[in-house]
Amino acid sequence: MVIVKKVILNNVKTHSKREFDFEKGINLILGPNGSGKTTLVESIFLALFGGDFARVIDYFKKGEKTMAITLILEDKGKTYRIRRKWVLENNAKLVESSLELIDTIPKKLASDHNKLLQQIKHLFGLDKKIIPLIYYKQNEITKIIEMDPRKRKEWFDEILGIKDLEEFSEKLKMAIKLIKTGKISRIEDRIKLLKAELNKKSLLENKLKNYKEKLVLLSNELENLEKEYKILENQYKEYLELKAKLKSIEGQINNINVKEIESKINNIREELNNIEELTDYEKDILSKKHEIIRCNEIKNRLKELEKEIKDYDKIKKEFLEIESKYKQYEEKRLEYEKAKMLEKEKEKAKREYSYLLKEKESLEKEIAELQNKINQIKELEKMEQELLEIQERIGVIKAKLKLLENIKDRCPLCGAKLSSDTIEHLQKEREKLQKEYYYLKEKYNQLLIKIRALEKYKGLEKVLEAKTKHLETIENRLKEIKPIIELEIPKIELDESIPYKYKQLLNKVSYLEAKIKEYERYKNIECPYDIAIEELKRIEDKYNKYIKKPALERELNLLLKELERYNSLLKEKEEILSKLNPEIETKYKELTKKKENLLSEISKVKGIIKEIESQIKEIEKHESTIKQLEEKKRKWEKLVEKLNRIVKALGRDGIPKALREGAINYINDMANIYLREFTDKYKLKVNNDLSIYAIPIDNPHYEIEAKNLSGGEKVVFSLSIALAIISWLSLQNMFMVLDEPTANLDNERTLALRKTFDKLEKMVEQAIIVTHNELLDTGENHVVRL
């Protein structure tokens, strides 16, 4: 149901900057020759299809470098804007191509030429192919009737898409050829090569068998060698261990000086005999020594404590001062906590106040809107009354229309014969009543929609009352909160260093008081340090000799153990020498070399076996590949078979013929339906060869070739066929453009054509007629004057 609403031209031929409005129904573009009428309608198609419609450079206004066309379309209640802009360089360059939905919020649907063409096809069903059906240039309105049947068939096939099917069929034939010579041929060559490779498999299998037998022999030989080697390996390990142990023992024996050890043992024993007599002094010396150590510890601790407690008085004084400040701090802190709580309450109140203000503002708006809707309900009664009046008037019109419906030549009431003027008058009256009926019907529907929309507002008084009460509650709460917000809270500053200093000094004082107590305790301990020193000096010489006894005993034990170890090593050396067999080493080295050679040979054979197996596997893969390739070949052959069937179906006696005949049958039926709206003199017949004939209603056996009809009749036939084709293409309610349809017609035929156009209004949503002939203006059509 697409119609043109507005065309805006900038520098298009004779039009510098102009806007043209169009309406639903018949639109006349009236003006003398050369006024730019044809340019205006061609601009519609230039906006839709750009350079695909015509050579853009020919439309630039002389001397201008830019040109723009804006087209406003309406379809299914939605409004669209198409804009194209060109600049003149060496040629006309398209710099803007856009499509927007401009109902409420603008939405861009396309921003380049190709996307725009796609959207025009998708949204409105328009493409370049249907231009000949909806746009008739000067002297072309009867071209469907007048063109040669062969050309008509070509034109008809292009519109139906049969030409596209033929092109598609040729492309399929080319694809079939490429598949046969390319894909299938390459697959066959590949299969041939792979089958040649398969013949090598048996030779490789025999070779593999020989090498596997050789590997078994070598493995058996290695197994026997391994058993012998394992026994000898353990013997050889024992041999090496004994050899290493012997070397270690000999080294240790050489490091021991036996004579020197024996001399030292004798000297130490003699010295120990001399020390035995000093044993009685041991307990006394130890007692005095412990007494001296204890006294030294007490003296040292007293010195440490004196250092620590010397600043006690000063710290105690500082503590008393800070204690007073701490008490003041605690009092102030309680006030601070109280102020902080008040501040939190105030902030909470502020947030609540702000929220309530917003809610109040929102409620006030809602109440105002509700009040407005309630006021609208009062208009409902007036609308309902108006609806009843319209219903009554529609009933009256329906009755009159029913009465006038079957008027031919006699009065439906009295049966009297009517004059032609009376019949014409009654027909005009009927048309007038029909227009009034459609107008009232539309008004009735609009009122009904408004009434239904307003009915939902009933019962809003209770909602308004509830909202008003809620508003009062909010206002009362705002009054309660306001004093809290306005409350002045005193600012209190706390010195946070005071509690820290207080705790620090308290810990110091407590620590020092504990140390003073410890100092007093140590001071009262008796310590006979000087007496113990005097007695220790008296027995010191004897003591110094005595204290050497443990060291001498330890040294003696070590020397005795070393002598014992020497004797043990000599014995162990003799045992090892009796076990050593030098032949084991020679035999072990020979066997190791033999094993290495055998392992190398086995590894080499395994490598060859692996390589042969890999080659066999690769060849076996060829079998799978051949199957896959053969399956692939079958698929391509099936595809070729299917494509050949499609090509056959697309041949002359296939789909194109069925499509053409189906379309011709449909067009015959629909064209006659449209033709009956224009005239009751003829029926229309379109043959399969697309020859067109007129059959007189009063003589159905007589056929007239349509091109031999009068000018006005040819126009009617052309329009009927065009409308039928549009219907076949599912493009009903499309707009139509006729350029100078009355050219070469006299006044009588022009007036007859005007009646045809009046009937055309029922068949298309919009018709735009370009003319210089004022006779086409009935006074009821929308006129654009140039």
Curated annotation (Swiss-Prot):
GO terms for molecular function: ATP binding; ATP hydrolysis activity; metal ion binding. It holds the Pfam family AAA_23. Binds 1 zinc ion per homodimer. ATP binds at residues 13, 33-39, 138. InterPro entries: P-loop_NTPase (IPR027417), Rad50/SbcC_AAA (IPR038729). One of its GO terms (biological process) is double-strand break repair. Residues 194-249, 337-455, 551-650 form a coiled coil. The keyword Nucleotidyltransferase does not apply. Residues 366-459 form the Zinc-hook domain. Zn(2+) binds at residues 411, 414. Its cofactor is Zn(2+). Keywords: ATP-binding, Coiled coil, DNA damage, DNA repair, Hydrolase, Metal-binding, Nucleotide-binding, Zinc. SUPFAM superfamilies: P-loop containing nucleoside triphosphate hydrolases, Rad50 coiled-coil Zn hook. Part of the Rad50/Mre11 complex, which is involved in the early steps of DNA double-strand break (DSB) repair. The complex may facilitate opening of the processed DNA ends to aid in the recruitment of HerA and NurA. Rad50 controls the balance between DNA end bridging and DNA resection via ATP-dependent structural rearrangements of the Rad50/Mre11 complex. The two conserved Cys that bind zinc constitute the zinc-hook, which separates the large intramolecular coiled coil regions. The 2 Cys residues coordinate one molecule of zinc with the help of the 2 Cys residues of the zinc-hook of another Rad50 molecule, thereby forming a V-shaped homodimer. Belongs to the SMC family. RAD50 subfamily. Homodimer. Forms a heterotetramer composed of two Mre11 subunits and two Rad50 subunits. This is DNA double-strand break repair Rad50 ATPase. The gene is rad50.
